[in-house]
Amino acid sequence: MCSSVAAKLWFLTDRRIREDYPQKEILRALKAKCCEEELDFRAVVMDELVLTVEQGNLGLRINGELITAYPQVVVVRVPTPWVQSDSDITVLRHLEKMGCRLMNRPQAILNCVNKFWTFQELAGHGVPLPDTFSYGGHENFAKMIDEAEVLEFPMVVKNTRGHRGKAVFLARDKHHLADLSHLIRHEAPYLFQKYVKESHGRDVRVIVVGGRVVGTMLRCSTDGRMQSNCSLGGVGMMCSLSEQGKQLAIQVSNILGMDVCGIDLLMKDDGSFCVCEANANVGFIAFDKACNLDVAGIIADYAASLLPSGRLTRRMSLLSVVSTASETSEPELGPQANTAVDNMSASSSSVDSDPETTERELLTKLPGGLFNMNQLLANEIKLLVE
């Protein structure tokens, strides 16, 4: 048994995802950290909590147990694509109102739940963003076909609540958009975004913890699709990132109010970057492997540092040093690495009524010529990481 002192740290997650790699690793790291620091620790599942207002005061019960000593810091992992403001966010607001320090805070999570909400928060801060349109309501996709034409074709079409690269399409023309409007699911609105051609099938994932860049990973598609997500078969390797890229990721994290986040950057021909997405519930199984890091351990260290008596550990304080040192040995991202693939073209084929099961057929493919930059890059990454 670990000794207990006044400081309390909780790990709050959702039953639907608690057995996934990131949650299991964070739980392991938090337990180890709390034993090392002799901190009182508890892991809690969202649906175990009962929120109360009694005699004008906020209260909390867990499986019938009245909680009298509240946590000072709560590490939160909730499935952001399905976050419900009337349930999940209500719990997080309740804990925050009781004086708990949440990482991430509920407003920060909401900033990343909807991709267009993310852009709304980032707009006006000088953050480079691809031009993006969206709409109110659920049935206005077809109406947007003409409105979004100024973005030019091909254009990117995304579900505002999509995740892991799903429900993302590259529409070649207005007719393709019209076809999509009849096939996609309309539970959430879609956004229409200017296509960054030179970053097709490639992006940079940056993980930021406590306002510091933990590491950076170049992700590359292996089959010509636009998305480079490792969950869709993409591969990744540790890479260096320019100071401009690092500062951009930190700026995005700060604007969104994030303690832990993953920022996806698209690469431009001139070596600069623009923001693609921000992830409040960032996965890191491929990131850990590619960058030889223990992201969960870094998260646990930062959580402990937020306690009243906490301080940044050596692992956290050395992050920037490690990041700088890696640039001497890892491939650099710059204008040469960002050379555009000029001969991309869109294609379509007959599809079933469910786009998520036939997404592959709707995606733009790179032509099967003798020279396919992304395929070569992906093969090199595989050789380096295997």
Curated annotation (Swiss-Prot):
Enzyme Commission number(s) from the entry: 6.3.1.17, 6.3.2.41
Q: InterPro entries, alphabetically?
A: ATP-grasp, ATP-grasp_RimK-type, ATP_grasp_subdomain_1, Rp_bS6_RimK/Lys_biosynth_LsyX
Name the enzyme's class.
ligase
Q: Where is the ATP-grasp domain?
A: 119-304
Q: State the Gene3D superfamilies in the record.
A: 3.40.50.20, ATP-grasp fold, A domain, ATP-grasp fold, B domain
Residues the entry annotates as binding Mg(2+) 1: D264, E277
Which biological process terms from the Gene Ontology are attached to this UniProt entry?
A: protein modification process
Cofactor(s) annotated in UniProt:
Mg(2+); Mn(2+)
Q: Name one GO cellular component term.
A: cytoplasm
Q: Where does ATP bind?
A: K158, Q193, K194, Y195, V196, K197, E198, S199, H200, G201, R202, D203, R219
User: One Pfam family this chain carries?
Assistant: RimK
Keywords of this entry: ATP-binding, Cytoplasm, Ligase, Magnesium, Manganese, Metal-binding, Nucleotide-binding
**Chain positions recorded as Mg(2+) 2 binding sites:** E277, N279
Q: Where is this region: Disordered?
A: 327-359
- Binding-site residues, Mn(2+) 1: D264, E277
- How is the cofactor bound here? Binds 2 magnesium or manganese ions per subunit.
Reaction it catalyzes: citrate + L-glutamate + ATP = beta-citrylglutamate + ADP + phosphate + H(+); N-acetyl-L-aspartate + L-glutamate + ATP = N-acetyl-L-aspartyl-L-glutamate + ADP + phosphate + H(+)
Tell me the GO molecular function terms.
ATP binding; citrate-L-glutamate ligase activity; metal ion binding; N-acetyl-L-aspartate-L-glutamate ligase activity
Q: Which residues bind Mn(2+) 2?
A: E277, N279
**Cell compartment(s), UniProt:** Cytoplasm
Q: What does this protein do?
A: Catalyzes the synthesis of beta-citryl-L-glutamate and N-acetyl-L-aspartyl-L-glutamate. Beta-citryl-L-glutamate is synthesized more efficiently than N-acetyl-L-aspartyl-L-glutamate.
Q: What else is known?
A: N-acetyl-L-aspartyl-L-glutamate (NAAG) is the most abundant dipeptide present in vertebrate central nervous system (CNS). Beta-citryl-L-glutamate, a structural analog of NAAG, is present in testis and immature brain.
NCBIfam families referenced in this protein's UniProt entry, alphabetically: rimK_fam
Which family is annotated? Belongs to the RimK family.
Q: What is this protein's name?
A: Beta-citrylglutamate synthase B
